[in-house]
């Protein structure tokens, strides 16, 4: 037993320096929504700490990024995961099974799942029920036969349902299902009963998206969605609020339940698609790569994520004061998240 403990300690001591020997640059993967914020932080960080190199930021989507992040410890694996939703219990289990046992969770701000369209489009307001009936593969368990928005709601125009949105690897796709589609689905008495008896089937019916061409996966590239909307009147795009904010000359936001996606409505959570954004730090890499601490410190500065921070100019919505204080403490202490608290 003593030999095994000594051997394990030796492996740990050898493996961590090996990361630094192989690379000194920090590497982050994950959310396309968090990407522009992480990129801006990386640029500031590189100017402040030129000897540490410019952090490498990759836009892979939250789900795909989690798989890479949780695949192991060592120079081949990312140091940080950017996420547009919280880590799932299944992802924490994957991390733990691959030796990634200590991860720090840091909320960096807020964003909203925005519905955008060309400024020339007649659509201006949708309810969550409208969106569910238009996009669900089997709304309330029945095949989706709706071809136009008027089929969904007689008060809407008779234009074809054509929505550009994120793929299954995206945290924005998860948020679409959880925040926008599930509430009107669960409001149905039959679906509420199903949730108690068969949660997996309930989730499939409430969050499953149609595959007949009405919903088009646009990849992990919100800028591509912006281009599609500008070129195709009467289509709708699902993207992060920051991308809508940056393209207000071309696009307009669609109200959901009568609430426009704005800084104020997301900050107050009165907008149904408001959600927190996170970064996850692989603690086992921190000692070997000083650039990780420098990046995390820059990302959580009040001058970055506060109400007057430079990331607000990029479309980030500042989290409440108490949340920012917790995030700044987490960045300093790097206390690991309790995997058991994740769902």
What are these model-derived regions, one by one?
Residues 7-15:
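Bacterial N-terminal signal peptides
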Residues 22-343:
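Flexible loop/hinge segments at secondary-structure junctions
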Residues 1-7:
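Bacterial N-terminal signal peptides that target proteins for export
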Residues 16-22:
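Sec/Tat signal peptide C-region and signal peptidase I cleavage site
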């Amino acid at each position: 037993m003593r030999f095994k403990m000594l051997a394990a300690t030796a492996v740990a001591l050898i493996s961590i320096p090996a990361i630094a020997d192989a690379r000194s640059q920090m590497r982050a993967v994950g959310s396309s929504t968090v990407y522009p914020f992480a990129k801006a932080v990386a640029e500031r960080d590189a100017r402040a700490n030129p000897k540490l190199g410019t952090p490498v930021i990759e836009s892979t989507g939250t789900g795909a990024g989690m798989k890479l992040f949780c695949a192991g410890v060592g120079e081949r694996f990312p140091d940080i995961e950017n996420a547009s939703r919280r880590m799932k219990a299944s992802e924490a289990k994957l991390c733990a099974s691959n030796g990634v046992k200590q991860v720090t969770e840091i909320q960096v701000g807020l964003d909203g799942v925005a519905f955008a369209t060309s400024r020339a489009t007649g659509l201006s307001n949708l309810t969550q029920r409208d969106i569910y009936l238009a996009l669900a593969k089997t709304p309330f368990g029945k095949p989706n036969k709706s071809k136009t928005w008027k089929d969904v709601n007689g008060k809407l125009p008779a234009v074809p349902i054509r929505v550009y949105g994120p793929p299954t690897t995206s945290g924005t796709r998860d948020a679409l299902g959880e925040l926008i589609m599930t509430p009107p689905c669960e409001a149905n008495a039959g679906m509420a009963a199903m949730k108690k008896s068969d949660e997996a089937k309930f989730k499939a019916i409430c969050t499953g998206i149609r595959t007949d061409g009405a919903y088009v996966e646009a990849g992990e590239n919100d800028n591509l969605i912006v281009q599609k909307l500008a070129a195709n009147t009467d289509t709708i795009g699902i993207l992060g609020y920051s991308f809508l904010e940056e393209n207000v000359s071309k696009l307009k936001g669609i109200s959901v339940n009568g609430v426009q996606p704005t800084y104020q409505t997301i900050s107050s959570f009165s907008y149904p698609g408001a959600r927190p954004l996170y970064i996850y730090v692989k603690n086992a890499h921190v000692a070997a790569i000083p650039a990780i601490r420098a990046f995390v410190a820059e990302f959580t500065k009040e001058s970055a994520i506060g109400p007057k921070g430079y990331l607000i100019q990029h479309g980030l919505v500042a989290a409440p004061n108490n949340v920012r204080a917790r995030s700044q403490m987490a960045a300093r202490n790097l206390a690991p998240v309790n995997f058991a608290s994740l769902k």
